[in-house]
Amino acid sequence: MIGAMPTKKLILTYVDSLRTDMLQRAVDEGRAPTFAALLDRGVLVPDCVSSFPSVTPVACAEMVCGKGADGHWVSGMNWYHRLERRYVEYGSSMEASRAFGVFRVLYDLVYNMNLAHLNPGVSTLFEQLDVAGLRTACTPFLIYRGRHRHQVSLDGLLRRAVDATRLKFRHHTWGPGELFYGDLYASREVPCKPSSIPGSRDGYSACCAAELVKDDAFDFLLFSLPDNDNYSHRHGPEASVESISKADHCFAKLIEAAGGIDAFLADYALILVADHAQTSVHRGLPLAELLERNWSVLQPSESQPERAQLAVSPTGRAAHVYLLPGEGERADPEAVREALSVIEGVELICRFEDNSGHPVTRSEPGTPPSDATAVIERGPRRLRFRPGDEVGDLRGRRWEIDGDLDAIEATIEDGLLRSETFPDPLARVWLALNCPHGGDFVLSLAEGYEAVDWGGVTHAGGGSHGALHAGDSLGPLLFVGCGPKDASEREQWTLRDVAPAVLEHFGLR
């Protein structure tokens, strides 16, 4: 039931891979006047913690569902589907998409991610607001599941690509009241030209959002600005002032449509957030190739998956490794762990073990046994932990821990575990390992390394993200006209706080 309805509508603006220091640099250089005006009027959390792995599908699901991967079930850019015995690839690169089949990737990315992979037992923001009778809207964004049915409307390059392969994408979907998803879904006619080309999508998103503002067509809008991610991948995060400036220009179109900054803020509250940050990448890590020296690794288009011993899912600067229950000789978990521990570039090895210290593995989707203990290994340093009462974290959760805190560069002060290098480390690793589709091993790579995707691509010479490291994980969270009066109301903010803040604004918490 709706509580006291707010006087302001709310726009949740997401800027992919936005780093707080680069945002501030753009403002200081006069390249982002719109964002500067919003920063002057709002409450900034400079170090909001992303998901782990800190990649867009996982982070966006966390943002919109208010839960970690154990709750929303999306585990990476690439993951192994234990039930279907295949990889799920969301488009790490065009080359990776070709390796798995472009149509298969498109189907998983657009349709299955929302209507099959995302936990059906968890409600998205759109679903909760739709049920409450609020008008919802979304420009192109990975997680859009809502209560309104939308017919597919192929257009432009995507139509020609689908027609050329003679594969028909004719599926309706369920989303917010107003849904724009490039060439695929458009809930109304707008004078906006969609683009399926990475790095050229902000303009279409801003055009659609401005039309919705002009028509007073929503109470809640998720407005996405994804192009900064592509620019940072190609040129490195230190060069992202250019793409931030373009995102600022696109946001200014909404301000203009509303009649200027004062008129805009009189009618709209704003939350601006990054899904993750980026760090510089210098080397690719061919994880599957290295493990193939000792085991049979499942390939993208494997005709006999039952013969494979391992599945390897690169996901930026993180990776999942799965032990497969094939028909042949199974890989020994301890041998796999030892092999991973000597690979240069693997910084953290995260896994579960039982009370006897034996590895816990899963052959089917589902959470591990209730007595499982998480382990983080970093070279010879080893830390075991599970929920308990021994020590707290900055989010208020409590843990039992045993081992070397140097594994995550952590200290305990006044009964609270802190790590500047790996923010919110215990909860993020625990959530990743408890994801039903998570690997038996979840890896976080060392600075400068990125896992080579199944298309043979890395962003060496540019930037990437995915690791547990602070450089990948910390981004801005800005509240204007809603949310806390001061950032210190929480000692540590994460993406899991975004959905509750939206619901609170509409009196639904």
Residue ranges and their predicted role:
Residues 6-11:
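Extreme N-terminal starter segment of soluble prokaryotic enzymes
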Residues 118-122, 306-487, 493-495, 499:
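Active-site neighborhoods of enzymes that stabilize oxyanions during catalysis
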